Amino acid sequence: MYRPVIASRKSIPPWLIILCVLGVLAALGIIIGLLVHFLAVENKIYYYQGGFKVLDIPYDRNYERETSLESNYLSKILENKMVEAFQNSNIYKQYINSQVITLVPDNNSVTAHIWLVFKDPWSNKENLRRRIESILRQMLENNPESLTTDPGSLKLTEISKVDAEKIINNRCGRRPRMSATYDRITGGSTAHKGEWPWQASLRVNGKHYCGASLIGERFLLTAAHCFQGTNNPKNLTVSFGTRVTPAYMQHSVQEIIIHEDYVKGEHHDDVAVIKLTEKVSFNNDVHRVCLPESTQIFPPGEGVVVTGWGSFSYNGKSPLLLQKASIKIIDTNTCNSEEAYGGRIVDTMLCAGYLEGSIDACQGDSGGPLVHPNSRDIWYLVGIVSWGHECGRVNKPGVYMRVTSYRNWIASKTGI
């Protein structure tokens, strides 16, 4: 019988298998290395600080006050000029941010200290610095406005990320981790990490019961009625961050300063200052909010944000994560209507929310911040959560202590 000849299979030599495996591993290593390299390069961030002089400005101490009208007006002009200069330059793709940090008045001039952030995956960093400096110098030389600037006074140096964050976090109302949007805490939504870095949790024996706002290294602002149950500093602690538990950056309380005219059980002068035993170390997630000038006006219809760990509904459950809600300031006359609060709202109070209800502060939010951003996206403390009729009721918006009415009192107790 015929049988076909079966060819014998030749086995692959072990050395060839090893060589193939090593080749594949080497190729994978190269690919991963290139990915890591390009991702690292793409995310290379450079930080700078510098300054220049604005001439022909009479000496005025108000330029030193970061919250003054004069300081914000001049800073806004200079920031707009920098944005325009960089966005119209050949490095506009590398540009991230630029801010005026401080203004220092002198005889007939003001020195603007600036802070800048760029990314550049390809250029030598010294070349990038020179290009930035050149654009700034050209901006100062070609100034068509009435503002007179001194190009020769320009200075610019690269700084580390640590130093850059320290500079920005020492200024009030800035949000390095800022979100591009803030949503519409009864009817609110969860806050992002570092989105509201001045928000604090006031605790009795470790349990959250009121909110507060960080206004200085050792001072917070809250509601006086938060201390109706206890005003012994030894029982109180303050913590920060977005989670109500576990406590983050917990601090002990040294002193509670309640407004002298506050009467327990009433709503007038519902303001208190908390002094901590030690300074708070500011970082991207924890730093102070700006206090408005006593003359600053926040008109009806202005958008504001309230934050806190208060109940989702009246006598309802409380969140573990910080909540935020966008609301609007309501005209006092409207809030004093018979349908609303029937004349109980005085000049030291303000209403905020919606007359149709649903979005509001609630139990556990008391003492917390009501804030508003100015045109430079710097946030100011407008109100302190005080009282209301339950939460989110129709014609019963939240009532807040108006911070501008207590600005001088706050300064007398804190030096801020």
UniProtKB/Swiss-Prot annotation:
It is a single-pass type II membrane protein. It is an enzyme of class 3 (hydrolase). Disulfide bonds join 210-226, 335-351, 362-391. GO terms for biological process: proteolysis. GO terms for cellular component: extracellular region; plasma membrane. Serine protease. This is Transmembrane protease serine 11B-like protein. The gene is Tmprss11b.
